[in-house]
């Protein structure tokens, strides 16, 4: 058993170090004899500890248990309610506490003043601006750091340097916190006025960020960056991250490309040894210098110096340091402003009459034409999704807030809730449901607001619109997205691509006669100037489309959509400002509509096209690519002569002038070698990603539990690590120890072992080995997995009560009746289950389920009860396969060059040997014929799980299933009788298995699983035709080989002689594999 259990026991003796503290290990075994010994051992430990006797003799007596059984958990109890943190902290508080500069920020409350100066009383106080929003406390974080420091105080050589650097940084944190005292959190991990009143307001979130940074320090450069950001972020709570990361947009334009990867016709990355010189006009250097001067003005010293030293020769090798600074800057934490300031920010832009109306006109027309192009085909064909748009909207209605809390009746139960799905049900029950009327959002019904906080940017507001807006927009937006899916201009939506494809697209056309124009248009999207032309363009497009059809239902759908745009042109928002709720006329576009992403992309594409058409009046060039990705757009322009400094200068100034004619406050840059957009940046022909995910501060509080957050923390750590920001793994494990412990009573706590947290069950939190997803196949692993399966689904009385009410039942049957032509138990049950699952976001239901799960878990962690089950997990399948594989050593040469310099060595090595992939493996079943057939006639979208169940039914049943969803009987019977059906069986099984094995997550998404180099290492003699079995054997082999390579940086070859007799057995088993959701899978999904 790995490092985790070792750290766990050391951590327990570190935290509970008093005389009265006892730790009792609990073991289990799948072997009945040994299991008896485990139970005896536990009983005696409890007995001895009650009598105050030592446990040492028992460890000797039960050596067989300790050596051969598996650690399940550690039970720890300790009577001293510790203020141990304070006691230990004093030893580190030897330095000078930081003093915040109280004039560093423009907005008064963003200064790190003593809380009682910002908020005179508890009544005024709000924690929302400094809330770390994570279910772990500052004291735990301090404990985790001190634990690490104590553990490593005797390190030697290089390890000692790391220790010294971290100790030095922690001294700053400890001294500052010690001056004011450690803030105590309440049971919800919030910091109340009483605790904070005599302490600096941002102390907690600052300290969390500082700890996260210091635990990510390895080299001397890390130390300098961290120290500077730590010290300054104590005062500057507003602009620090922006100042530090601004230069990157120019730095990417300074490095020559000497060899790069480009996308070829087959959509693969292929190496090109082209050389492209970075052509940089003087003005660009002046702008960069100004940014560096601003950094110095803000008190930064080392970071600007590092940038200036790099500028001497602008080498790609040393660029990793620039990339590091860029990533680190985000770890100062979130900028959380008051809502009023976030909203007024957009309204401050002054109107000028002096704008180029012709350009606005062109922009509007381009939006109109794009909308028409996207929707023309579905509208002309009276697409069933547009005809049944209301039903489609209801089926995919989320359980997010509808803006206001209402009293709802479900049977005898009366509850208060803001959730959309519950409001819809209630409205239908009371006959108040009128999807044909889009409520106004004018001064009488102003829009309530949500918020989005991001490091290094201002807080943005989000509209919480009534559910009618969602229903009206859903179907149309889905059609827009499916058009964008096969349009390369829309980088974000382009079919199954990933960011590597977009990277190859840019580098492909870079040469001595081309330049790339890249613009960050986030300011434009939320500006008032955009509103009228944007909404009008959409309205005009919808009007044109309405004339292309005679179907009243399609016209109605388009009209409702149009109505949402008309209403939003006259929008008011409500902002709580202290006690009063202010109503403000809000003339800008904000997120919150279903169309936000799609419509912004359309608008940004129209914007860059408008700009390019103006530039074309003056220069002669060919536009090689135009791309829009979220808030950014970029284009590669090819001229008929080599690009000169003079040209870059002129084009750059012209582009900026053109944007300014539209009053668009955007950041437009021109370069010959690289770009920087929000999602990725390309420099020196290589691709980089910002590793900016905060670990110890969260953007907002959701309804995830501590276990979920431990999994999210680990997932964030992995993503950062892949992107070049590594936090000490021991620290992360210590956090997981803290966050997954379960309190039994005040003094009793249970700490799960590594086996519990890494086995893929509903409780999985992390992987024993970073980047490697293991599926345990030993007896003990399968035993514990079975045990956990028995307590996975917990009931909730509240949910059952709501679900058995007439209101709920009527709603579900209304959906079923509208959707189905004839009875279909699978679908009806599916809808009921989905609707019931949406109730989970209603806190009381969630808490009830959670409590039940925790108490079941407590029982299980003290004594696992395995149960015989006919459920088969992916582990069972792999366990059947494993014995037939024979391993031999092999070798693969490194044959591909690096294109993603930030990757960890072991992952980089694997890619360099087998190559990378530029596509997502299809794991949703949407490519199968049955899925296409259903979507041709119905608005219902079966999940991969449902398809997997349906495709293995008898042919007659499949036919009934299809017919009930509105597929014509003749099509259904043709389908079942054709070869396509048997291909589908294979396709869906394949997708399902890929889905189970998380092939599109973590670092697996980077590897080319179909690499011929990988295939060379696998030998499986061909026996009989069961493609599904061949598939699983090959996939298993590939994962084994890749996992081995990640772990050992060397290769193995696998030979498998799978008996024909076993094949049929395996094939049958493969049709009832159970999938489970765990905090770990949700965290991965959350990353998506």
Swiss-Prot record:
Task: State its Enzyme Commission number(s).
Answer: 2.7.7.48
Q: Name one GO molecular function term.
A: RNA binding
Keywords annotated in UniProt: Magnesium, Nucleotide-binding, Nucleotidyltransferase, RNA-binding, RNA-directed RNA polymerase, Transferase, Viral RNA replication, Virion
Please give the SUPFAM superfamilies that the UniProt record associates with this protein: DNA/RNA polymerases
Q: Kindly report, in one word, the top-level EC class recorded for this enzyme.
A: transferase
Residues of the RdRp catalytic domain:
501-687
Highest taxon of the source? Viruses
Q: How does it assemble?
A: Interacts with VP3 (Potential). Interacts with VP2; this interaction activates VP1. Interacts with NSP5; this interaction is probably necessary for the formation of functional virus factories. Interacts with NSP2; this interaction is weak.
| Protein name according to UniProt | RNA-directed RNA polymerase
The source organism is: Rotavirus A (strain RVA/Pig/United States/Gottfried/1983/G4P2B[6]) (RV-A)
């Amino acid at each position: 058993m790995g490092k985790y259990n070792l750290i766990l026991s050391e951590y327990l003796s570190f935290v509970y170090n008093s005389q009265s503290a006892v730790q009792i290990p609990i073991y289990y075994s799948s072997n009945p004899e040994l299991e008896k010994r485990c139970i005896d051992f536990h009983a005696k430990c409890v007995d001895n500890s009650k009598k105050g006797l030592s446990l040492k003799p028992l460890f000797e007596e039960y050596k067989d248990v300790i050596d051969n059984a598996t650690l399940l958990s550690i039970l720890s109890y300790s009577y001293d309610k510790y203020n141990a943190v304070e006691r230990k902290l004093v030893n580190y508080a030897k330095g000078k506490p930081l003093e915040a500069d109280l004039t560093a920020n423009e907005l008064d409350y963003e200064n790190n003043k003593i809380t009682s100066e910002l908020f005179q009383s508890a009544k005024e106080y709000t924690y929302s601006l400094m809330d770390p929003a994570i279910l772990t406390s500052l004291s735990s974080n301090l404990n985790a750091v001190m634990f690490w420091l104590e553990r490593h105080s005797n390190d030697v050589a290089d390890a000692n340097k790391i220790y010294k650097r971290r100790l030095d940084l922690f001294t700053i944190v400890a001294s500052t916190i010690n001056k004011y005292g450690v803030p105590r959190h309440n049971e919800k991990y919030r910091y109340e006025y009483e605790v904070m009143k005599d302490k600096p307001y941002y102390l907690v979130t600052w300290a969390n960020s500082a700890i996260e940074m210091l635990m990510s320090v390895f080299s001397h450069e890390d130390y300098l960056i961290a120290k500077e950001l730590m010290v300054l972020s104590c005062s500057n709570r507003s602009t620090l991250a922006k100042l530090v990361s601004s230069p990157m947009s120019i730095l990417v334009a300074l490095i020559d490309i000497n060899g790069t990867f480009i996308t070829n016709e087959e959509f693969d990355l292929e190496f090109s040894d082209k050389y492209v010189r970075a052509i940089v006009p003087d003005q660009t250097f002046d702008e960069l210098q100004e940014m560096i001067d601003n950094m110095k003005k803000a008190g930064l010293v080392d970071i600007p110096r590092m940038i200036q030293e790099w500028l001497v020769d602008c080498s790609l090798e040393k660029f990793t340091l620039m990339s590091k600074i860029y990533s680190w800057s985000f770890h100062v934490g979130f900028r959380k402003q008051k809502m009023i300031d976030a909203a007024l920010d957009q309204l401050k832009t002054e109107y000028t009459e002096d704008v180029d109306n012709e350009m606005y006109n062109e922009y509007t027309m381009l939006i109109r034409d794009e909308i028409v192009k996207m929707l023309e085909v579905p509208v002309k064909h009276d697409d069933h999704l547009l005809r049944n748009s209301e039903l489609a909207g209801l089926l995919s209605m989320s359980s997010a807030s509808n803006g206001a809390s209402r009293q709802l009746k479900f049977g005898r139960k009366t509850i208060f809730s803001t959730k959309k799905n519950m409001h819809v049900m209630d409205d239908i029950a009371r006959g108040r449901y009128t999807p044909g009327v889009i409520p106004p959002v004018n001064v009488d019904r102003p829009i309530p607001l949500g918020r989005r906080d991001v490091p290094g940017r201002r807080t943005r507001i989000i509209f919480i619109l009534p559910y009618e807006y969602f229903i009206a927009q859903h179907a149309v937006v889905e059609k827009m997205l499916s058009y964008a899916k096969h349009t390369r201009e829309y980088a974000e939506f382009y079919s199954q691509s990933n960011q590597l494809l977009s990277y190859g697209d840019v580098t492909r056309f870079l040469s001595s006669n081309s330049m790339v124009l890249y613009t960050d248009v986030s300011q434009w999207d939320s500006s008032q100037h955009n509103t009228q032309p944007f909404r009008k363009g959409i309205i005009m497009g919808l009007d044109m489309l309405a004339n292309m059809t005679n179907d009243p239902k399609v016209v109605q759908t388009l009209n409702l959509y149009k109505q949402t745009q008309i209403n939003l042109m006259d929008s008011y928002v409500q902002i709580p400002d202290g006690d009063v709720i202010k109503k403000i006329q809000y003339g800008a576009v904000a997120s919150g509509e279903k169309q936000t992403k799609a419509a912004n992309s359309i608008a940004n594409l129209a914007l860059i096209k408008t700009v390019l058409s103006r530039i074309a009046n003056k220069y002669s060039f060919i536009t090689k690519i135009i791309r829009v990705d979220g808030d950014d757009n970029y284009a590669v322009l090819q001229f008929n002569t080599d690009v000169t400094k003079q040209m870059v200068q002129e084009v750059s100034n012209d582009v900026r002038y053109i944007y300014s004619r539209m009053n668009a406050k955007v950041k437009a840059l021109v370069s010959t070698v690289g770009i920087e957009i929000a999602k990725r940046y390309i420099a020196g022909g290589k691709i980089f990603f910002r590793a900016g995910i905060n670990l110890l501060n969260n953007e907002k509080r959701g309804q995830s539990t501590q276990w979920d957050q431990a999994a999210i923390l680990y997932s964030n750590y992995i993503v950062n690590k892949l992107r070049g920001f590594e936090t000490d793994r021991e620290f992360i494990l210590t956090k997981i120890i803290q966050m997954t412990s379960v309190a039994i009573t005040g003094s009793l706590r249970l700490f799960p072992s590594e086996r519990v947290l890494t086995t893929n069950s509903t409780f999985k939190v992390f992987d024993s080995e970073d980047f490697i997803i293991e599926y345990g196949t030993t007896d003990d692993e399968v035993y514990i997995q079975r045990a956990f399966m028995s307590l996975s689904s917990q009931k909730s009385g509240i949910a059952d009560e709501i679900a058995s009410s007439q209101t709920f039942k009527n709603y579900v049957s209304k959906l079923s009746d509208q959707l189905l032509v004839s009875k279909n138990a699978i679908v009806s049950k599916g809808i009921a289950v989905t609707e019931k699952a949406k109730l989970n976001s209603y806190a009381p239901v969630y808490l009830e389920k959670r409590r039940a799960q925790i108490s079941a878990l407590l029982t299980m962690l003290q004594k696992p009860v395995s149960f015989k089950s006919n459920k088969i997990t992916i582990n069972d399948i792999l366990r059947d396969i494993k014995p037939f594989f024979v391993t031999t050593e092999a070798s693969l040469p490194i044959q591909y060059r690096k294109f993603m310099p930030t990757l960890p060595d072991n992952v980089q090595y694997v890619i360099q040997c087998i190559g990378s992939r530029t596509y997502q493996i299809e794991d949703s079943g949407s490519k199968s014929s049955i899925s296409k057939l259903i979507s041709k006639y119905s608005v219902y979208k079966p999940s991969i799980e449902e398809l997997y169940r349906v495709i293995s039914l008898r042919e007659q049943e499949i036919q009934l299933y299809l017919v009930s969803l509105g597929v014509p009987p003749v099509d259904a019977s043709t389908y079942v009788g054709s070869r396509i059906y048997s291909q589908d069986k294979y396709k869906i099984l394949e997708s399902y298995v890929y889905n189970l094995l998380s092939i599109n997550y973590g670092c697996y998404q980077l590897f080319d699983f179909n690499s011929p180099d990988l295939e060379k290492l696998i030998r499986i003699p061909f026996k009989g035709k069961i493609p599904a079995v061949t598939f699983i054997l090959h996939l298993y082999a590939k994962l084994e080989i890749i996992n081995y390579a990640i772990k050992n940086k060397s290769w193995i070859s696998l030979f498998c002689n799978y008996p024909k007799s076993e094949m049929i057995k395996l094939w049958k088993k493969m049709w009832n594999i159970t999938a489970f959701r765990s905090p770990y899978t949700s965290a991965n999904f959350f990353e998506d």
